[in-house]
Amino acid sequence: MLSAEELDKVEAQKKTAEDLAFFTIGYEGITPENYLNKLIINNVKLLCDVRKNPISMKYGFSKNQLKNACESININYIHIPELGINSEKRSDLNTMNDYKRLFDEYEKTTLVENVDQLERILNLAHKYQRIAITCFEKEPRICHRSRVADSLKKLPAWDIEQRNL
């Protein structure tokens, strides 16, 4: 996706910090190149895809395309479908109240039923030091990844700085 020259330019901007960090990132409204640049600049070592179905109409963001792109720039990729939301539940979201209702239900069901996956992310964060979770929406408050991030903060052993890219 990136030429050697483009990759060198992005690498030059890369954060040298190796401290523990956790990011959330959405790909809505940006190109695959811009998305990958954000990961490189923030020295992300592992991308966790929390979409239920990692298929995208947007070029570069379906599971295999994204996995291959990440691996080509030495970023590991894993898919954690257990933390996704079924697409039929997302079909009638028109207001912020609709999103809030959906995410409140998600928090009470999916996240409670999948604490093992949250603990898995915690363990991966300690292993890789700098990780990100990803989904589609640009704005975290209208994406379930914000609820995943909030639930991670509640884990007793969670002591990691979080920010949205």
Labelled PLM ranges:
Residues 1-165:
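Residues lining hydrophobic/aromatic ligand-binding pockets adjacent to catalytic sites
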